[in-house]
């Protein structure tokens, strides 16, 4: 047993309290994710105006729409897919976004679905650009290149918040014994950090490679969608399936099943891009 294995014993998921409200590391990490994604996108607009012919004010307006779509979609998606009492929320819709418990204590909004956030993001992007659909693929590409690094902070936030634990490490796994985290007296994979690396860093490198080698609007979001789906499918083998759902056919988790659907959506965007997008003009 090493110091890393027992890090949760010495770490408090609450960063500080402000006016009686407990601020969690996850909230701070999520704020960092938004800031990183925003400024990464601005940097891309400045460095490659031919690929991203968007004014800053225009992007700022779009970013608000996209972020709102992500938050709404992520929360509603969680309630519909993962929440055991989803029927209650369907009849008490306002409770989905209620940050207070029945006693009036602030507990924040807990439970977000990445795939739900993706749906919300796509809907928001379409609604924002419906008057000029030629820019839709440009917006999607811009988010595809700025989202992965922000995603890293989100998964680190999950780790600091001590949630979304990994599967139990087999006793014969030497690497697992080194990197595992003790949770309720069981050594588990740090799946949140594995996801941060695979779905964040690796996917970012994939999209950057695509940016260098492709000249058609819409291909970056396709590479992101396919790359994320693959990395999420792999990472799910180290992540404990949601207790209320378990696994399905072929022992696949809900995250893996949704990743398959994400591949289908990505291929649909690819078909749309090849028919409706023009190549980026060279200097």
From Swiss-Prot:
Membrane topology: Multi-pass membrane protein
InterPro entries: Lgt
Subcellular location: Cell inner membrane
Residues passing through the membrane, by range: 18-38, 62-82, 106-126, 136-156, 190-210, 218-238, 252-272
GO biological process entries: lipoprotein biosynthetic process
Keyword Iron recorded: no
GO annotation, cellular component aspect: plasma membrane
Keywords, sorted A to Z: Cell inner membrane, Cell membrane, Membrane, Transferase, Transmembrane, Transmembrane helix
Domain of life assignment: Bacteria
Main location: membrane
Known EC number: 2.5.1.145
Molecular functions per Gene Ontology: phosphatidylglycerol-prolipoprotein diacylglyceryl transferase activity
Pathway given in the UniProt record: Protein modification; lipoprotein biosynthesis (diacylglyceryl transfer)
Residues annotated as binding a 1,2-diacyl-sn-glycero-3-phospho-(1'-sn-glycerol): 155
Role of this protein: Catalyzes the transfer of the diacylglyceryl group from phosphatidylglycerol to the sulfhydryl group of the N-terminal cysteine of a prolipoprotein, the first step in the formation of mature lipoproteins.
Family in the record: Belongs to the Lgt family.
Name used for this protein in its record: Phosphatidylglycerol--prolipoprotein diacylglyceryl transferase
Taxonomy of the source species: Bacteria, Pseudomonadati, Campylobacterota, Epsilonproteobacteria, Campylobacterales
């Amino acid at each position: 047993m090493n110091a890393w294995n027992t890090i949760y014993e010495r770490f408090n998921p609450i960063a500080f309290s402000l006016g009686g409200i407990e601020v969690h590391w996850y909230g701070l990490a999520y704020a960092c994710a938004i800031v990183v994604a925003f400024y990464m996108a601005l940097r891309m607009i400045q460095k490659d105006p031919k690929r991203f012919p968007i004014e800053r004010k225009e992007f700022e307006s779009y970013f608000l729409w996209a972020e709102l779509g992500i938050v709404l979609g992520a929360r509603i998606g969680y309630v519909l897919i993962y929440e055991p009492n989803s029927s209650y929320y369907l009849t008490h819709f306002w409770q989905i976004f209620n940050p207070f418990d029945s006693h009036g204590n602030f507990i924040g909004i807990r439970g977000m679905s990445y795939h739900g956030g993706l749906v919300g993001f796509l809907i928001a992007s379409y609604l924002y650009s419906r008057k000029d659909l030629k820019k839709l693929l440009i917006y999607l590409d811009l988010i595809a290149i700025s989202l992965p690094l922000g995603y890293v902070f989100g998964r680190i936030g999950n780790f600091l918040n001590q949630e979304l634990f990994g599967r139990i490490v087999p006793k014969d796994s030497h690497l697992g014994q080194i990197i595992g985290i003790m949770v309720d007296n069981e050594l588990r994979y740090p799946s949140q950090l594995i996801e941060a690396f695979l779905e964040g860093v690796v996917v970012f490198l994939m999209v950057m490679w695509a940016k260098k080698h492709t000249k058609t609007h819409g291909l970056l979001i396709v590479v992101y969608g396919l790359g994320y789906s693959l990395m999420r499918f792999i990472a799910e083998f180290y992540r404990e399936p949601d207790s209320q759902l378990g696994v399905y056919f072929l022992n696949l988790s809900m995250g893996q099943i949704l990743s398959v659907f994400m591949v289908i959506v990505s291929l649909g965007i690819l078909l749309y891009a090849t028919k409706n997008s023009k190549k980026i003009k060279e200097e």
